[in-house]
C-alpha cells in the first residue's frame, strides 16, 4: 500500500502542512520536528508527489540544462558544477542533450520543455537559434548562459581570446619564434564562438610580435586527443616543423604530446607544447596550460540562475572568470640551433 502524507503526519504527530514544510526543507520547522518527520517518512517509504508540490507552490524545482555534448570533458564538468549547486538547493536537473540535431534542435527542446515544466534554463556554451529564443520567451522563466554572451540574458564565461594570448606570450617569452597552432573545428550546427576567438588570440599575438603565421603551421582537429594526435603528426612531421605548439584545448595538446613521442621528438627539448583548460590529465602528463575553472563556472552560473528564480533582477550581466598560466614540464626555451636562426621579435603593444 502506498503511504500518504496523512500517514506520515500521524506517525510523526504533526500536521500535514508541517510534514510538507519539513520535507521541502523550508524554515519555521524545529530540528527535532524535522527529524521526526524524516524518520516517519523513511519508515513508511513515503515519496512526495512532485505534481502536488508544484501545484501548491507554483514551482517545479526543476532546472533545464541545455548542453551540446554530455560526455565531453568541458561540458561534463560544467554540468557537475551546476548539479552540485542545484542539489544543495533542492532542485532537480532536466538535461537537454541536443547533440548534432541541427535543424531539429528547436523541435527537440520545444517538445520536452513545454511538457515538462521547468523553473529556469541554463544554456551551456551554445548560441541559440531564433526559434529557441522564442521558445524561451514563451516559457517566461529565468535564463543564464555559460560561455556565449547573449544580449538577452546574463552570462558566465572566460575570455577565450585571452587564453591563447597568454599561451602564445608564454612561448614567445621563452624565445620561440616558429610556433604552430592546433585549433578546434567549429561545428556548423552549434556555431561555437570559442574556436574563432582562440585562433584569433594566437594569430594576433604573433602579429603583434612581428612573427609569421604560415598556412602550414596551423592545423585543425575536433577537440579530442585522438584528433590532436592525428593533426599533431601532420604538423610535427614537416621538415620545417615548429619549435613550439599552442593547442586550443588540453585534449588536443595531449594528442600532440602523443604525436611527438611517436615521431621520436623529445618534449620540451625538441618541441614545446601548451594547452588550455587544465584537464586532470594535464598534470599527469606535465602539460603546461592556461587553466580555466570549469566546475566553478557551472556553479557561478547556477547560483545566478537560482537568484533569478528567487525574484532578483540580474539584467544582462556578463561575468568574466579569470584564467591563469600553469607552467609544467612541457615548455622550455627552443633548441639552440633554432634560436640562432629565429627571426627577431618585436615587443608586444599589449
PLM feature spans:
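Short beta-strand segments enriched in small/hydrophobic residues
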Residues: 18-20, 56-71, 170, 178-188
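Flexible loop/turn connectors
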Residues: 232-350
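Alpha-helical recognition/docking segments in bacterial nutrient-uptake
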Residues: 3, 62-169, 173, 350
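Short acidic capping loops at alpha-helix termini that bridge into adjacent secondary structure
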Residues: 177-178, 213-217, 267-272
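N-terminal helix-turn-helix DNA-binding module of bacterial transcription factors
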Residues: 1-61, 74, 335-350
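Periplasmic-binding protein-like
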Residues: 65, 115-124, 180-182, 218, ...
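Hinge/beta->alpha junction and helix N-cap segments in small-molecule ligand-binding domains
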Residues: 68-77, 96-105, 156-166, 182-233, ...
Amino acid at each position: 500500500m502506498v503511504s500518504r502524507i496523512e500517514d506520515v503526519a500521524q506517525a510523526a504527530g504533526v500536521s500535514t502542512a508541517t510534514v510538507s514544510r519539513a520535507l521541502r526543507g523550508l524554515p519555521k520547522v524545529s530540528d527535532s520536528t524535522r527529524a521526526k518527520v524524516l524518520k516517519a517518512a523513511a519508515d513508511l517509504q513515503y515519496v512526495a508527489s512532485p505534481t502536488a508540490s508544484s501545484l501548491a507552490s507554483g514551482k517545479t524545482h526543476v532546472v533545464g540544462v541545455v548542453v551540446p555534448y554530455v560526455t565531453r570533458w568541458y561540458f561534463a564538468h560544467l554540468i557537475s558544477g551546476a548539479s552540485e549547486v542545484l542539489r544543495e538547493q533542492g532542485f532537480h536537473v532536466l538535461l537537454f542533450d541536443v547533440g548534432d540535431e541541427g535543424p531539429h534542435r528547436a523541435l527537440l527542446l520545444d517538445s520536452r520543455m513545454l511538457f515538462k515544466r521547468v523553473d529556469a534554463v541554463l544554456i551551456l556554451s551554445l548560441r541559440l537559434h531564433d526559434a529557441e529564443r522564442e521558445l524561451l520567451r514563451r516559457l517566461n522563466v529565468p535564463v543564464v548562459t555559460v560561455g556565449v554572451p547573449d544580449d538577452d540574458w546574463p552570462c558566465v564565461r572566460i575570455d577565450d581570446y585571452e587564453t591563447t594570448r597568454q599561451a602564445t606570450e608564454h612561448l614567445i617569452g621563452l624565445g620561440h619564434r616558429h610556433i604552430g597552432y592546433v585549433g578546434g573545428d567549429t561545428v556548423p550546427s552549434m556555431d561555437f564562438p570559442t574556436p574563432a576567438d582562440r585562433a584569433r588570440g594566437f594569430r594576433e599575438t604573433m602579429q603583434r610580435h612581428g612573427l609569421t603565421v604560415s598556412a602550414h603551421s596551423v592545423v585543425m582537429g575536433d577537440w579530442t586527443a585522438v584528433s590532436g594526435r592525428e593533426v599533431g603528426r601532420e604538423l610535427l612531421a614537416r621538415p620545417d616543423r615548429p619549435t613550439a605548439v599552442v593547442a586550443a584545448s588540453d585534449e588536443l595538446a595531449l594528442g600532440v604530446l602523443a604525436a611527438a613521442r611517436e615521431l621520436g621528438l623529445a618534449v620540451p627539448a625538441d618541441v614545446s607544447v601548451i594547452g588550455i583548460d587544465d584537464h586532470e590529465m594535464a598534470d599527469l602528463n606535465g602539460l603546461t596550460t592556461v587553466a580555466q575553472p570549469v566546475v566553478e563556472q557551472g556553479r557561478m552560473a547556477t547560483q545566478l540562475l537560482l537568484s533569478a528564480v528567487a525574484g532578483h533582477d540580474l539584467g544582462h550581466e556578463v561575468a568574466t572568470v579569470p584564467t591563469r598560466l600553469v607552467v609544467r614540464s612541457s615548455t622550455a626555451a627552443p633548441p639552440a640551433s633554432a634560436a640562432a636562426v629565429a627571426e627577431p621579435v618585436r615587443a608586444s603593444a599589449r
